[in-house]
Regions:
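Sec-dependent signal peptide recognition
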Residues: 2-11, 229-233
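Surface-exposed, low-complexity/disordered Ser/Thr/Gly/Pro/Asn-rich loops and linkers
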Residues: 58-126
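Extracellular and analogous surface-interaction loops
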Residues: 122-133, 188-196
């Protein structure tokens, strides 16, 4: 098992990869356009915790304790949501101005009885196609500037492949290396699916303080990444060949 710090800028998240899936972090999200969410993308899942939201014409379906989303399962010993509540987060301080983005980040689900070390929530995305490349994104902002920082261990599993990453959900400024905890961002997991289901486990670390806090699920998307066309590959290989001959 190889432990990888993504880079010095995003040292707030540490990844452990057993196979080929890769993690990355967005730049701070500001406008709706900055999210990369687009009706031109092909999505298998767009899920909003607590209340539905629409960003750039893409509808994020409401996942709450009383509702379900097709091909999406939330498993938790306890289920709660908080709606239209920014708490200590000040969007303007973080440069967040997009109305759709703010709507997505203003509500979330969480495990009310799962704030202690070892407590886990699972989010399962069904209906995937084996061999297809996907980007799964978790949209994140802070809730509480004090306390533990809300450390979370994430584990992404599809078939025989498991990739893990850990970080402080309530400390975007640490994660992004900017020092501004009011910023928002997304965690991206790119993988070639080995199964028809992706399971995402969000666990309060064993070393966390009692009552550290469960994962807040504001929004999630899973989009298809098209394979490069044969023409694109041919052009790329041709350019590589030209570059080698010129050396």
């Amino acid at each position: 098992m190889k432990k990888i710090i993504l880079n010095t800028v995003v040292a707030g998240f540490t990844a452990v990869s057993l196979q080929a899936g890769t993690f990355s972090l967005s730049a701070p999200l500001t406008t709706d356009a900055s999210t990369g969410i687009s009706a031109a993308n092909t999505y298998t899942h767009t899920v909003s915790g607590g209340l539905p939201a629409t960003v750039n014409g893409v509808v994020f379906a409401d996942q709450s304790p009383d509702t379900t989303v097709p091909n999406f399962t939330w498993t938790s010993a306890s289920k709660n949501d908080i709606n239209n509540n920014a708490n200590a987060w000040v969007a303007a301080t973080g440069g967040v101005t997009g109305a759709g983005l703010i709507s997505l980040l203003n509500s979330f689900t969480y495990a009310g009885g799962g704030a202690d070390p070892g407590a886990t929530q699972r989010f399962s995305l069904a209906g995937l196609t084996v061999g297809t490349i996907y980007d799964t994104r978790l949209y994140i902002r802070m809730w509480d500037p004090g306390g533990s920082g809300r450390p979370i261990d994430f584990k992404f599993t599809h078939g025989s492949e498991t990739n893990s990453i850990s970080g402080l959900e309530d400390r975007p400024g640490t994660v992004l290396g900017t020092g501004n905890n009011h910023q928002a961002f997304y965690l991206n997991y790119r993988f070639t699916s080995l199964a028809t289901t992706l399971d995402i486990d969000a666990t309060v670390p064993a070393a966390a303080a009692a009552g550290s806090g469960s994962f807040h699920m504001f929004g999630l998307s899973n989009q298809v990444i098209p394979e490069p066309s044969s023409l694109t590959l041919a052009l790329a290989l041709g350019l590589i060949g030209i570059g080698r001959r010129r050396r």
